UniProtKB/Swiss-Prot annotation:
Signal peptide: none annotated. [4Fe-4S] cluster 1 binds at residues 13, 49, 78. This is Ribosomal protein uS12 methylthiotransferase RimO. The keyword Ion transport does not apply. It is found in: Cytoplasm. Keywords: 4Fe-4S, Cytoplasm, Iron, Iron-sulfur, Metal-binding, S-adenosyl-L-methionine, Transferase. Catalyzes the methylthiolation of an aspartic acid residue of ribosomal protein uS12. It comes from Brucella anthropi (strain ATCC 49188 / DSM 6882 / CCUG 24695 / JCM 21032 / LMG 3331 / NBRC 15819 / NCTC 12168 / Alc 37) (Ochrobactrum anthropi).
Length: 437
């Protein structure tokens, strides 16, 4: 009897990708095969995103495609928290579960397509099945979020903060390193709040006591001999404690902090505690400790109540802070978000669009000027793509998929996952160009 085959669709953020990896690891450990195509598979699982209307539409379309091409579909993920929405559009799905419901997903799979007898558990690698390239992996340290930003429905979808004990996280990281992973990307909904919900619970790791805390996690990961990159860091004061580890080279000099805006009025409406003057001073202090630091952030323009003055404050903040990487989103109303009940004036779509373009032009100018300063330097670069002596990689200041790249020429063949020294010869708005030395 051949093993049952399951096709898998993973939508949304890196946190959802980790959920998908866990489900696929469970499937493989029970003898299921993973199919790249819906047609011919015994079942399709769709891990959905439900944060923005555009993401909900994409998820519903993916479910429809799976039903058309296969017919047997199990839905999980954030949109699964709203089963009525899914059933209204697609009444024939086999089962619907919410996010992080790994056991419920597996139960639904067992009911629809029972596993083959005597699965070969040893076919599953110790680090589990990963959907990223072999040389980097996402490490999820917690679920949920206890903040109540008015534009966000993550707490409603994924619940309040639930931190993984630090020994569990470090064991997973160790398995990843032993499997050859060269870069670990730490993710959660609120990385710097790690351990707060369990009162920074202590655990034993390598014969010493460590706390379930952002600082301890950073220090221990920094001793594993790989690149460690911190994502989704909320700007709490204790983030300052981690900057010296970056200056020492323990973890990458990179902070992904979603500031969202700079206007005090908009931040208040967003229920975000940060203030533009304080964040500017914080960034300046971080750079004094670690001059090599790169800051990435995301911002929302066109938030309800945002005035031209508010937007100008944001542009001025960009000029002052000069962060290395910035993404920008036009505000979309999210069903269930508190922002819908604030009674604020909506920003017209054409103004949102114009502000988005102005923001991107401003940040492009800043990025271009900062990257010019890299020309002539020799930088370590991790190779993401290689074709003989031509390749593409990333510096310590760039995360995969969301940041810039280094386009490389080399005398010797390049290999994906290698970290090579590159002399930077040129730059443009977002990328660098250089020669491996």
């Amino acid at each position: 009897m051949s093993a049952p085959r399951v096709s898998f669709v993973s939508l949304g953020c890196p946190k959802a990708l980790v959920d998908s990896e866990r489900i696929i690891t469970s499937l493989r450990s029970e003898g299921y095969e993973i199919s790249r195509k819906h047609d011919g598979a015994d079942l399709v699982i769709v891990n959905t995103c439900g944060f923005l209307d555009s993401a909900r539409d994409e998820s519903l379309d993916a479910i429809g495609l799976a039903l058309n091409e296969n017919g047997k579909v199990i839905v999980t993920g954030c949109l699964g928290a709203e089963p009525d929405v899914i059933r209204e559009r697609h009444p024939n799905v086999l089962a619907i579960t919410g996010p992080q419901a790994y056991e419920s997903v597996m139960s639904a799979v067992h009911e629809a397509v029972p596993p083959a007898h005597d699965p070969f558990v040893d076919l599953v690698p110790p680090q589990g099945v990963k959907l990223t390239p072999r040389h980097y992996a996402y490490l999820k340290i917690s679920e949920g979020c206890s903040n109540r930003c008015s534009f966000c429905i993550i707490p409603a979808l994924r619940g309040d903060l639930v931190s993984r004990p630090i020994d569990s996280v470090l064991r997973e990281a160790e398995k990843l390193v032993n499997a050859g992973v060269k870069e670990i990307l730490v993710i959660s909904q609120d990385t710097s709040a790690y351990g707060l919900d369990i009162k920074y619970q202590e655990a034993m790791w390598q014969d010493r006591t460590v706390r379930t805390k952002f600082l301890d996690l950073s220090r221990e990961l920094g001793d594993m001999g790989v690149w460690v990159r911190m994502h989704y860091v909320y700007p709490y004061p204790h983030v300052d404690e981690v900057i010296p580890l970056m200056a020492e080279g323990k973890i990458l000099p990179y902070l992904d902090i979603p500031f969202q805006h700079a206007s005090p009025a908009v931040l208040k409406n967003m229920r975000r505690p940060a203030h533009q003057e304080k964040t500017s001073r914080r960034i300046q202090a971080w750079r004094e400790t670690c001059p090599d630091l790169a800051v990435r952030s995301t911002f929302i323009v066109g938030y309800p109540g945002e005035t031209e003055e508010d937007f100008e404050i944001l542009l001025d903040w960009l000029d002052e802070a000069k962060i290395e990487r910035a993404g920008c989103f036009k505000y979309e109303p999210v069903k269930g978000a508190k922002a819908n009940d604030l009674g604020l004036e909506q920003v017209p779509e054409e103004i949102k669009e114009a502000r988005w373009h102005r923001f991107m032009a401003k940040q492009q100018q800043i990025s271009t000027n900062l990257l010019k300063k890299k020309v002539g330097k020799r930088l370590p670069v991790i190779i993401d793509e290689a074709n003989g002596t031509i390749g593409k990689g990333r510096t310590r200041y760039d995360a995969p998929e969301i940041d810039g790249s280094v386009h490389i020429q080399s005398r010797r063949p390049l290999r994906v996952g290698d970290i090579v020294t590159v002399k930077i010869e040129a730059s443009d708005a977002y990328d660098l160009h250089g020669i491996a030395v």
